[in-house]
Amino acid sequence: MLLSYNADLLPRVRMLGRINYTEPWIHFSRTIDEYVLYVIRDGNMYLQEDGIFYHLKAGDFFLLEPGLCHEGYQRAACNYYYAHFTHPEMARMKDEDAAMALLAEKRRLSLVSYNLDEADPTDSITYLPKQFHLPGSEFNTILRTALDCYNAREEHYKRRTAALLHSFFLEVAHEHLLARGAAQGKKLKKSEVVAERLLHYLNENYTRPL
């Protein structure tokens, strides 16, 4: 399941934190009007949302959606980050394959783009997975930085926290695209990137003497 996400717009963060339940715990039932992000550091979380059951493990990224009832269905110890936020242009996608094909094309266009051009090589829409296993532990660094910023409550702390969360989302979208491409055996060869960049350069500079 994918959610479209306009990368030109920051999320509005209401709350961000980290909880460590060392004793088995079960999530309470609720329906809220905002997105909730969970990133599991250690342990397990058992959730059902809108009748679908999920088992989250260490390293998992998960997004709860507004307006859908969610609750736990099994007790477990769990250490996790959470963020409650809204976003003006974020919605569930119907055609996931088409969305990922579009994102793969955006990656190709970005790789062959000239980075001094004023215009961005693609539009601002990316796609976030609802559930994804993060490939490394680096996510801890950016989430810990965001949490420190949020807890410090210095000037513009929510905007700075939102910017960090936004960066994290873009990284997750990128890693999900790479993981999906690897699973499907698709990879843009370096030679193709070089050829595309050379073609772009020639098109831009064909009137100049070489």
Predicted regions and their residues:
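Generic protein-terminus/edge-of-domain signal
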Residues: M1-A77, A91, D95-Q131
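Residue-level marker of positions within ordered structural domains that often coincide
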Residues: Y21, D42, P88, N151, ...
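Short beta-strand segments
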Residues: F62-L64, Y82-T86, F169
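Short regulatory "switch" loops immediately downstream of catalytic or recognition motifs
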Residues: T86-K94, E175-R180
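Short, Lys/Arg-enriched, Trp-marked, Pro/Gly-tolerant hinge/linker segments that flank
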Residues: S124-S137, Y150-R208
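Short, Lys/Arg-enriched alpha-helical recognition elements, typified by the DNA-recognition helix
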Residues: N140-L147
